Amino acid sequence: MITKKIRVYGIVQGVGFRPTVSRHAAAAGITGSVCNKGPYVEIFAQGEEKCVKDFLERLENQPPKRAAILKINTEDVKEEEYGKFNDFQIIESEKTKGEIFVSPDIAICEECKKEMYDPKDRRYLHPFINCTCCGPRLTILDALPYDRERTSMKEFPMCPDCASEYEDPATRRYDAQPVCCNDCGPEVYLTGREERGRAAIIATRKMIHDGGIVAIKGIGGFHLCCDATNEEAVQRLRTLKNRPAKPFAVMARDVEAVKQECLVNEVQEEILDGHQKPILLLEKRKKSADSTGLCKSVAPGNPKVGIMLPYAPVQMLLFQYDDGIEMPDYLVMTSGNTSGAPICRDDKEAVEELSQLCDLILSHDRKIRIRADDSVMDFYKGEPYMIRRSRGYAPLPMMVTMPWKGQVLAAGGELKNTFCIGVDGRFYLSPYVGDLEDLRTVKALQETIHRFETLLEVEPEVAACDLHPKYNSTVVAEELGLPVVKIQHHYAHILSCMAENDRKEQVIGVAFDGTGYGTDGTIWGGELLLADYHGFERMGSIEPFLQIGGDISAKEGWRIAVSLIYQQTQDKEQTMEIVKKINLCSEPECKVLLAMADRKMNAVLSTSAGRLFDAVSAILGIRTKSTFEGEASMALEFAAEAYEKEIWEIDEPADGESGPDEEKKEPEDRLIMKTGSLIKYLTEKKTEGIQAEKLAYIFHQKLADLITDGCRKIRKKTKCNYVALSGGVFQNRLLLRMVEEGLEKEHFTVLRHHLIPANDGGIALGQAAYAMQYIQEGK
């Protein structure tokens, strides 16, 4: 007879871990106990040596589906120390300090789906059905350990039948904290109306069927929903939400419905129908003009559509119910918020912000503690490439194997905000918060930071934030009453890529995005940095240009285009002639802009790669203005991709005009990538009538060549052979592939993002990593 004390670390709460341990104990024929300690699960296993060994093998090889075991510690203990165990028991949770791992929310499992649509089951059509394998976790959690009384389900006492299942080791709901049924669980209802339960769901389905718009409360917040096959309904939602062109996310009935509209490979299907169920950006199928399905206005001008499957029971009931209403196979399911505001999470917010955008509000009385917008995932070379990391993924920690000790908070960026809490080598990125230009989002950030600090039981020693003095994220960090460390935006991008790839040594960082406050007070965004966790050096950039017109220039790429053309010609008349030839803007608009350039009025020096893409899109006549962030740049990418599909070889630009053979030098002697010469070439070829798609492709290829050549020259100086690619521009998969392949041909080792976004949704990780190193160095 032996006794072992076992501690299991990882995602072991809210995933049915203790019931699974109990079943393994029974199968192996051992006695003992299992207790949730908060940071870990503690097990005592007592029995014959072969039985205990069998139990440990089962524990390691057959964990619950949703668990993530990071490590298992075992030690022998004496029987007299803990006594003899007569059976195997699940002991009430105890609170213990240590490493903490919180489970994200888990999509409805197959077993619960079957029960929900079984007329003989007592949870038939129950909108909140769940078990140990699925259901809300992070979004209902007040504190750890994960038990019902520390969740928003504490307001719903279990009925005798649910309590019986909860206490029975033989059931799937043994120790399932959110367990409930139609008799004792939360209830759906229409706000401001009498319909509740069944009547509310039927009214919602009828409204959507008839072309209406409904706000629907899910797991992490509200969605705005309408029939995605109804052009009139989608256009009305666009008008109400003031969203003329930005793609809407779609929820499909099932995998087969997705395959009707999109090309889906095995990897994508597995993720699409997995337990996280993010929005996947999938390529649209080519369809005939008279085919039915998704209407064009869902994702206009985009070769892809963002699509997901139902992950909450109430969402499944929208598609299938016993009321005889035939619902479409596709629903628009876009975030329930007004422009710039965070996703609504309660009735008060929904009524105030969404009432004018919808015909009904379907809510429920289970409180959402933490907002969690949908995650968005693209694919690159067959692998996941995260665009927005939120529901289903947050707050799973990123592990970095640096010998760091301490606790830090990073406030993240101003746009696409997420924050990050670092504890030693573990970094917990929050769900998506949003754009902090809106004070409601700032408030949401502050609330979520406080809740995460409580949940993870941390007291940060340092707050990290962006270098920009006027960012609201900077203000939030400064108001925490902690020492503040400010990190340059693009340096944080590169550190986030290093941390995700667990790179400890120096890299050449290629940080390409829309904007970031530089150490010299100008706008950066097309940078080559030499970086490690101690600091960075700006080694190069794209050619600086005047960004005229302030914030509006980010939406009107033609302004940057005029500035770039003028920078090349240095002649007003010649510039106006070119602008007229390519129909870039009116003559009066051009004159005003040139005058502003001469006087440096409302103009700032910039090396923004994002604005460069916008300008090229305008020059080529693809998009002169953007109605949403990245619209012009995306259109340029799509045009280049369309050309690549048609033609495999292109003509080289004449006389090497766009080549990077002669880099310019700024006063500080940094390498300058000759993007100005590339603009000159593209403008000339456009006036000659060369196909815009071809020129878009040439732009991508030549920019990739400039980046590769710049990295090669930096390597010659520094001997650094690792390159990290980060920043929102690298969501452009064509540029990413061209740069990566170009660097690999030069025998560089290339680091890129995978499950941490390359955009500003990932920079909090880089900020936190720097702050952790800052603590180690005792700065």
Model-predicted segments: where are they?
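Short glycine-rich phosphate-binding loop at a beta-alpha junction
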Residues: A215, E457-P469, T718-V729
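A contiguous, well-structured pocket-lining segment that forms one wall/lid of small-molecule binding clefts
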Residues: P178, G185-E187, G413-R451, S563-C720, ...
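Conserved phosphate-binding catalytic cores of ATP/NTP-utilizing and phosphoryl-transfer enzymes
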Residues: K259-V264, L317, I343-K348, D374-S375, ...
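A phosphate-binding glycine/aspartate-rich beta-alpha loop in the early core of alpha/beta enzymes
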Residues: D76, C159, G221-K286
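Internal gly/pro-rich beta-alpha loop/helix module
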Residues: Q62, E165, D323, M327-M402, ...
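Intrinsically disordered, low-complexity, mixed-charge
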Residues: M1-P178, N182, Y189
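Conserved phosphate-binding/catalytic loops in two-lobed NTP-binding clefts
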Residues: D466, G481-H493, N721-A724, R733, ...
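Glycine-rich phosphate-binding/hydrolytic loop that grips phosphoryl groups
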Residues: Y491-F512, G516-G518, G557-Y566, Q701, ...
